[in-house]
Every structure is written in C-alpha cells, then in structure tokens.
Amino acid sequence: MAGLSRILLSCTLACLLAGQAAQASVDDPTRAGGDNRVRALRADQARRDVLLTACRDDPGHRRGEPDCVNAERAQALQQWQAAAMTSVDAAFSDLAGALRNAAPRRMEAAIVRLTRQLQPLVYSMMTLLVLLTGYALLARRDRPFEWHIRHALLVAVVTSLALSPDRYLSTVVAGVQDVAGWLSGPWTAPDGAAGRGGLAQLDQFAAQAQAWVAQLAGQAANDANPGSAVNWLLCAMIVAASAGGWLCLAASLLIVPGLIVTLLLSLGPLFLVLLLFPALQRWTNAWLGALVRALVFMALGTPAVGLLSDVLAGALPAGLPQRFATDPLRSTMLAATLCATATLMLLTLVPLASSVNAGLRRRLWPNAAHPGLAQAHRQAAARQYAPRPAAAAAAAGPHQAGTYAASATPAPAPARPAPSFPAHAYRQYALGGARRPPPRVRRDDRPAPAPDRRVLPRKPNLP
C-alpha cells in the first residue's frame, strides 16, 4: 500500500505541475491566434504542403514548433473533410488523425480550467496529502490511500475556510460569475475569437444549424409541389432534431457540472458544521460524494465536448448549404449522421463517468451505507443490551442447548432505549466499542435431535 501511495502521489503532483505549465502556455498571447492560423493553413494548401515537407525533412528540430503543429492539425481536418463522402476506412483513418491532433489540446484546457477554479482547495489538499502520506510512511502506519484522500479533502476545505475565507469566497463567486456569463452573455467575442471555450464552438454550430433549417424550411415553403414540399420539411425536421440533440447534450455537459460544483461549494460551510453532530454526519458524506461526482463530470465532459466539436467542425463539408439546394436528401443524412454520431459518443461518456464515480465511492467511502457515529453507537448499544447466548439457549428448551443454540429463536430484547446523547457516542467510538464486530456464533445446519418418546417401564413399588 505504501508503494501505491507513492505512485498516486507522484501522478497527482505531475498533473498539478502540468496544469500550471499548461496555464502559462495558454495565457501566452501568441497562442490565442492558433485556431486562426489553422484555418488559414487549411485554406492555403500550398503553404501547408511546404510546412509539412520542411517538418518531415527535419523532424528532430522542427517537429515541436507551432507552425508544424498547426500544419498537421490543418492537414488532419482537411483530410477528414475530404473523406466525409468517401469510404469508411479512409473516414476512420482521418478521424483518428483528427482525434490525435485535437485531444492533447482539449485535455490541456480541461486541466487548466480545473486548476484555475479550484486552485486554493487543490493546493491545500495536496499539501495535506503530502504531509499525511509522509507521516504514514515514517510512522509505518498501514492506512489505505483512500483514507488520506478523504481526510485531506475534509481538512483542506476546513483549513481554506478558516485561514483564507476570502479566497474560498472568491472561488465560489468566480464560479457564479462564470455560470452567469454562460447563461446571459454572448459566447463569442465581437472580433470572432473564442470567448467561452467550447461554448463558442457550440454557438457557431447553432448558427450554422439554424441557417440549414431556415434554408430547408424556405425551400419547403416555396415549392409548389406538395410531395416535394413534404420532403423538404422532413429534411428540415431531421436536421433540427439531430443538431438540437447534440447542442442540448453538449451544453448541459459544459454548464451543469460547473453549476453543481458552484452550488455545492457555496453550501460547504453548512455541511461542515454538521460534522459536529454525529447523527448528521451522513449529510456531510453525501455532500462530499456529490462534489466528487460533479468534479468527475466536469473533468470528463469539458474535453469531450471540445474534442467532438473540433471533429464535427472538420467533418462537415464547407459547401453544405449549396449541397442542400442540389442534393437535399444526401446532405441531410450526412449532417444528421454526423450530429447523431457525436451525440452517441457523448452519451457513452455518461456510463463512463458513472463507473468512475462508483469506483471512487467504493474506494473513498467503503462504508457508504454507514451514516456516521450515530449508527455505530446504535449497533454497539444493540449488541450491549442483547440477551446472552446462554440465556437464550436456556429459554429455548433442553433440546436446543449446546451445539444447537444458534438455531434457536432468541428471546426478544428488552425495550430499553439506547442512549442517544453525543458524549456517549464519542466515548463509545473512542474506546473502540462501536467498531468491534458482533460476535460470530457457530451455526450448525444439522436438525435438532428428536426427543425420545419411548415409553419406559415403570419401576415397581417395592415395600
């Protein structure tokens, strides 16, 4: 277990350092025009070929330069767009290229976002986790790593509230402002740059889908043939349903986890106060579990939506509105298939996040059905006031004693209420009585012997 603690601790610290490095690289103003350069290289094939040739001739020195990276991304997106109407093998190969070029950037942006929003809590938790793990290794305490994570999370929240409440409040206010900006303000900047990350791409796609539906509906309204008008209208409904499903699911995965995290952090002090009352500690455990689940959905949903938005933008042909006018059915099925595929890929993220949450709940809270000290005290009190096995066997009869005492029906426990004041619960917990498992009685499955009902001869009455 000590080796697992070291491995997980090293991985967590590496992720934090990667997040800080990624944040520094994202804040660089030269990186803001990366998408514009990719679009320019995607349109200028001659310049893209020159850059790709130069990068392939000297891969050791120029492979990691921004021009080479942008050229490779533009080449992957161009190949995927060209293969949208070709064979399945070429489409899947170019899809793999697009994923390979877009996935690192999306994961990097997700790490930066989580590091920015939860920086005070994360660094307090990591400091305490290092201290607890070091103490466990030095003192040779055999404690599971989940115990360190659970206690470090609680102590980090309490410490951040006690020592720097202004930073905790600023974290909550920043989350509220972010959600309010998503719901009210424009998702794209006036100059066309991406102002809200993945939501800017969703806004652009929503504008494109609205134009497609308007074009198809206009064709249906202007067509004098009723049969053709119905076909145009069906195409418009198919495009609206597929694009609307993708937009609703992607926007919900981007907005709802952040909203839930902000709400839970704002209610954090209230749930931490409940730790003082043993009967209400299960509410604090439920709050921590909900916070972890929301963070998992935020960490998985944001890069997935951004990655699929990039792939969908590269897969849709550039002249799709003109194709709607010439070949409406085939163009409609192409757009609907791409949107439905992206929606199904997002839907597969839900069971993945649920399985991750279930694993975290089993590892971090192995006794999830155990609400706290109150139930532990009640279990200890029930064992304390339960009748002893000898008394139960004596009350059951002569043939139920000995080996067959466990199969007897025990006598009902006396109706004496267990003490419920907190001092007794803490004393029971401190003395170890609440954590002691109940005594296991050896059970014998053999039936009880039948009583001897033979008639014995009476003894003669001798004088």
Curated annotation (Swiss-Prot):
Subcellular location: Cell membrane
Residue ranges with Low complexity bias: 376-410
A family per Pfam: TrbL
GO BP, one annotated term: protein secretion by the type IV secretion system
Signal peptide (UniProt feature, chain positions): 1-24
Membrane topology: Multi-pass membrane protein
Positions of the UniProt region annotated as Disordered: 376-463
Induction: Cotranscribed with ptxABCDE. Activated by the two-component regulatory system BvgS/BvgA.
Residues passing through the membrane, by range: 118-138, 232-252, 253-273, 294-314, 333-353
Principal localisation: membrane
Disulphide bond pairs: none
Protein name: Type IV secretion system protein PtlD
Species of the source: Bordetella pertussis (strain Tohama I / ATCC BAA-589 / NCTC 13251)
Organism placement in taxonomy: Bacteria, Pseudomonadati, Pseudomonadota, Betaproteobacteria, Burkholderiales
